[in-house]
């Protein structure tokens, strides 16, 4: 078995009693009924498609009820992350974000992109922002130049998004993302990436 198969085999099943008898769900499907989506692991195209599909499904179920996005991610693909971000902004329901563990790179951008006043971290979460990474490019000098220009445009776009959601000016964002900038939950709150640090569930 590969890692994905092992991980899937370890996902718990929940059995519910209904008028029609028993029904079993994997734990994530059961939580989806409560409008909870998990964004866990590397941000890549397949995972992004699943998150986008869940956001659209929950909007179709009830366009006026909040969706809760739990994030534990080291980041990943910028384009995949932006597809999730754009969908969060596009749909009608507010998307509340919660960092559990870590939200780094694109994970941090998605955390900050939650609905205003509804962005949270658990106390021992870590958040990290940085500029988009340019992998080991190969090819002609002209191709490398094209990709270098694209990465600069992406950097500007991501800085603008972070500035919009944090209230920090572009110059501050550009300086702070020039290298990896790590923050604990309180620092992330002070920076404007989140609104509150939660150590207990707020009832009601």
UniProtKB/Swiss-Prot annotation:
PROSITE patterns: CLP_PROTEASE_HIS (PS00382), CLP_PROTEASE_SER (PS00381)
Principal subcellular localisation of the protein: cytoplasm
Catalysed transformations (reactions): Hydrolysis of proteins to small peptides in the presence of ATP and magnesium. alpha-casein is the usual test substrate. In the absence of ATP, only oligopeptides shorter than five residues are hydrolyzed (such as succinyl-Leu-Tyr-|-NHMec, and Leu-Tyr-Leu-|-Tyr-Trp, in which cleavage of the -Tyr-|-Leu- and -Tyr-|-Trp bonds also occurs)
Example GO BP: protein quality control for misfolded or incompletely synthesized proteins
Keyword Cytoplasm: yes
Keywords on record: Cytoplasm, Hydrolase, Protease, Serine protease
EC number(s) given by UniProt: 3.4.21.92
Domain of life: Bacteria
Active-site feature positions: 105 (nucleophile), 130
Broad EC category: hydrolase
GO molecular function, one term: ATP-dependent peptidase activity
Annotated localization: Cytoplasm
GO cellular component: cytoplasm; endopeptidase Clp complex
Family: Belongs to the peptidase S14 family.
NCBIfam families given in the database record: clpP, PRK00277.1, PRK12553.1
Matching PANTHER family: ATP-DEPENDENT CLP PROTEASE PROTEOLYTIC SUBUNIT
Subunit record text: Fourteen ClpP subunits assemble into 2 heptameric rings which stack back to back to give a disk-like structure with a central cavity, resembling the structure of eukaryotic proteasomes.
Function comment: Cleaves peptides in various proteins in a process that requires ATP hydrolysis. Has a chymotrypsin-like activity. Plays a major role in the degradation of misfolded proteins.
Protein name as catalogued: ATP-dependent Clp protease proteolytic subunit
Primary gene name: clpP
């Amino acid at each position: 078995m590969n890692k994905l198969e092992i991980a899937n085999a370890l996902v718990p099943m929940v059995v519910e009693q209904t008028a029609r008898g028993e029904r079993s769900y994997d734990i994530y499907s059961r939580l989806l009924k409560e409008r909870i989506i998990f964004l866990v692991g590397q941000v890549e195209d397949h995972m992004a498609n699943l998150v986008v599909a869940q956001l659209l499904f929950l909007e179709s179920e009830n366009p006026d009820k909040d969706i809760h996005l739990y994030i534990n991610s080291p980041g990943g693909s910028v384009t995949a992350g932006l597809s999730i971000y754009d969908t969060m902004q596009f749909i009608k329901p507010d998307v509340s974000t919660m960092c559990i563990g870590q939200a780094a790179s694109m994970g941090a951008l998605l955390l900050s992109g939650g609905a205003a006043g509804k962005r949270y971290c658990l106390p021992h979460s870590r958040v990290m922002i940085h500029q988009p990474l340019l992998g080991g490019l190969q090819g002609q000098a002209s191709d490398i130049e094209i990709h270098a220009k694209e990465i600069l445009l992406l950097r500007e776009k991501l800085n603008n998004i972070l500035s919009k959601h944090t209230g920090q000016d572009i110059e501050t964002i550009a300086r702070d993302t020039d290298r990896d900038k790590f923050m604990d939950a309180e620092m992330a709150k002070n920076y404007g990436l989140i609104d509150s640090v939660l150590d207990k569930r707020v009832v009601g």
